[in-house]
Amino acid sequence: MKRTTRTAALTAGALIAALGLPAGTAHADDIPPRVDLRVLVVSDGGPATDAITAELDTAGTPYTEIDLGVAGRQVINAAFLADTVLGRPRAKFQAVVLPNDNPFAAGSAEMAALAAYERTYGIPQVDAYTYARPEAGLQDAAQGGYSGRLDGVRAAVTTAGKAGPFGYLDGPVPFEDNDPAVNESYAYLSTPAAGADFTSYVDAPIPGKSTRGSLVGEYRHDGRRELVVTFVYNQNQQQFRLLARGIVEWMTGGVHLGATRNYFAVHVDDVFASDDRWNSTLNCTPGDVDCADPNATPDPIRMNAADVTFATDWQTRQGVTLDLAYNAVGTVDQRADNNGVDLLADALLAKKTQFRWINHTYTHAFLGCVQNITVVPWKCDTNANGTTKWVPLADISTEIAQNRTWGQSAGLPLNNKELVTGEHSGMKVLPQQPVDNPNLATALSLNGITSLGSDNSREPAQRQLGPALTVPRYPVNVFYNAGRAAEQVDEYNWIYTKRAQGGSGICEDNPATTTCLPAPLNTATGYADRIVPLETRAALGHLLSGDPKPHFIHQSNLTEDRLAYPVLNGVLDGYRALFADNTPVVNLRMEDIGIELQRRAAWQTALKAGQVTAYRIGNAVTVQGPFGVAVSTSLPTGTTMGGAAFGTAYAGRLSGWNPSIGLPITLTLPASATATAAATSGSLTATKPAPDTLVPAGVIEQVADTASH
């Protein structure tokens, strides 16, 4: 894998002249250049550059991508990289991402153009995944370093990393090991080359040695700066998700369009009501429309007063507020059947201000088509002419209004704009009901609903439904019909095992969407050993990816064995073990999540349409977006806008949405945010192409967690 390399030195002036860069740009002391807030990504189609572009997409940071494998692609030259605007030199990109430290052929004019550009304008370069070699500021990995897998290894942010771009992390950077039988990582660990100006930001132990090798570090040379990454990753792996923010902050100097935060919200459905219980003998849920066994007797699961105390104590301990989606009929019926007594409702109402509340309709009725439940699975009932029979507008409106009226009379701190229908009904549900109930949009309008919870597993994209925007919610795979761990595991086994193993065979019939377990889980240990780790990892993955969508569970998960808490604690405790205090979990209510999703979509649309202009000149940042589209920016602490403080603090930076009226917005950076000075003398060193690097199959395609090792 090692290659012998020779270098050739050229004076900066000679190289710039040869490339035809605008006169005077090598000496920027006369007129400070304009640097556009856009990233250039040169891709080889590999997972590392794809991961970085995915992070830029999530944040809303604009970039131009050039795929080296595409015929007829854009040639990288001086004219492509820089020009002059109104007499001022302009750098068209604030940062460059390459697949490695030199992905071009020997003697490449494109690599020379990039090197000259970076030096001239002080533009940083990210080597997304490169071999450890002297040309990247490191000793050759084959000479006392390490080349191989790092599955399960606990890397760490160095002191320099914490003081620099990775100050939002607490220290540990654990590498995934989802399946011991699959290689999910590969890295080249090494130490700085002799005489190299290299600072490691993230490192790991070199196997068999007492020293640690760099995984991410900054190499300063020839008037240029490179972030050298010597391990491969994909956009879903935890090790990348932890470092993604820092990579973007390093390459942009903390000045860029777009922003990300880490969100986590938990909706608890069916509060005040009860949920039907899984029957391990009948393998169905008595009381549910799909359980037609004549011997099926419902055995409901309902919270009690002690569960309320546990929930409020948990909220205080974790710093997260639960959103309770309530059905008032649950307590109305409970009091009617028990001489006015409902200890659960009394406890919840006594602590009502400690929760957020969402209207979940009065009776949890199905609000789509009229269901024919005489068949399994159910189907939509039809009129005499064969058309679908829909739940009427009056019924939908009554469900919404009656529940709201009860909540208001009980003094619940409601947001009347929010609604979650029972089972997300009214909206389309495949295969039985392929379209929305046409009466739903009108009912939403009549009741002032603008934020409507939906099921992310059915419809992951936000959409408009009448006056409302949907808020897709992630279902947590802790079943609504299980109050005890043994019940959860029994139903899990029924769904995910083959018929020959006593299961339903659903996984056999639907291999594209469901994977069969190799064997049934132990009902005593399977929940803690497999289900909790899987659900924790999934939810934590959403959190680490900057996804604001909420997760939903059911009130049955907060009682009896309190099945939800091991998952929720795993997510929040796991998060806090990885992140510094300046990067807390952001816990929004549903309406605010919907607004965040809407703003992101509008911002992405504006970026793709080329409707956003943003650049930096010295310590002034100018951003102009289309009228009515909020502008997203991330800037250093101390930034001001019109003399007032800008944004809110998160992860050591300031970020925020600013409403746009279509005119330029000017922000002033603090004096500490000095742009990297361009080099004006010395030589540039041309290097040979970077050696090939290994990319395991377990990185190309994300490996499912076996959760059993």
Predicted stretch roles:
Residues 1-28:
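Secretory targeting and sorting signals
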Residues 29, 123-206, 627:
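An acidic, glycine-rich "communication" segment
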Residues 30-32, 213-214, 218-318, 561-593, ...:
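Extracellular ligand-binding/catalytic regions of CAZymes and related secreted enzymes
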Residues 38, 101, 118-121, 128-141, ...:
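Metal-dependent polysaccharide deacetylase catalytic core of the NodB/CE4 family, i.e.
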Residues 40-128, 133-135:
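Helical hinge/lid and interdomain linker segments adjacent to catalytic or ligand-binding clefts
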Residues 67, 244-265, 309-330, 408-410, ...:
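C-terminal domain-boundary segment and adjacent tail
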Residues 138-139, 190-203, 208, 212-224, ...:
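Active-site-adjacent pocket scaffolds in enzyme catalytic domains
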Residues 221, 231-234, 248-277, 401, ...:
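Catalytic grooves of carbohydrate-active enzymes
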